[in-house]
A protein has these predicted regions:
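N-terminal accessory targeting/assembly segments
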Residues: 1-99
Length: 99
């Protein structure tokens, strides 16, 4: 079964949108090489990284719902997450997270 992915690019403080876009383009190529289809992409900017999800809880929940609405099997995030953040994403999104 071919998986369908939602990619999330996050512009952190100190990084510009063009850099995030470039990293998202690279991520798209890597995911496609793995045989995973890209169903949806989102680029977000955050002012301050949050401990639980990197994004705020409401925004993370919104991204999970958006992935479901686009029939995505997996969410791929272009930033490093702490082990706790990854676990929180996996629990919230039913283990459908790649970092």
């Amino acid at each position: 079964m071919v998986e369908r992915a939602m990619l999330i690019g996050i512009t952190l403080p100190g990084r510009d949108d063009a850099t995030t876009r470039s990293l998202l383009d690279e991520l798209r190529e890597l995911v496609t090489t793995l045989g995973i289809g890209i169903q949806h992409e989102v680029q977000l900017s955050i002012r301050k990284p949050q401990a639980k999800f990197l994004l705020g809880t409401g925004k993370a929940e919104e991204m999970i719902e958006e992935a479901k609405a686009h029939n995505c099997d997996v969410i791929v995030i272009d930033n490093e997450l702490t082990p706790a953040q990854q676990r929180n994403w996996e629990q919230a999104a039913d283990d459908k997270i790649l970092v």
